[in-house]
């Protein structure tokens, strides 16, 4: 592991593995950060780059009032300690620590350095409380422009028990399935595509080559979550219209209903004609 990130990075990862070519892990001084680091190391492409970015959010220390100075010291120390533990847990290509807002800095680094996947730990809360009170996970869901791994305890540094993919016939779901199947083949995991039978089912999702699909009479969110366990990885696709900030209610419902980690595969918008 290097003490400081180089000016630029690159990876030979291609095809479905390309999103695992440059993994950027957010470290914020919480145990969930270590889970994100471990799982980021598992999914990283064989010739991929993994970077640990620790961020001490020192502005939070001001909430301690007269004890702000002590709180600031403790916050910085905790973040540095988590970075050191993460560096021992995963073979990172680069690691560094800074201060500011974790998600903003991750997004800036993603744009500046071409990261293909951000990994961040999620604390145990539900969607309503996350949307009401905020948090790094919900900020990352709204603000990141690359693929995102929302990490929960259950696997890592070992592979997930199986990979569960949300399938609905959309381009985003197709991209997620391609990535999920490729990752499953590389890690040696079973892949379970889940198809909801609620409403009009796209005939394309029932094609012959998807004989391993799990057909479920429940709505897709419930079906996907029901097919997963704590040791699984759910893979779901998302899209973003040009000029609009993404707000994926469907993906949020998956993320906050699931008991396991969720990989959100970013499907870039088509170029205008």
Task: Provide a role label for each language-model segment.
Residues 105, 109, 113, 223-227:
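CheY-like receiver
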Residues 119-122, 147-153, 262-266:
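Short beta-strand elements of ligand-binding domains
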Residues 38, 84, 107, 138, ...:
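Active-site phosphate/pyrophosphate- and oxyanion-stabilizing loops and adjacent acidic/basic residues
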Residues 15-69, 92-94, 159-214, 226-233, ...:
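Small/aliphatic-rich secondary-structure junction motif
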Residues 1-7, 15-19, 110-146:
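Helix-enriched interaction subdomains in cytosolic or periplasmic regions
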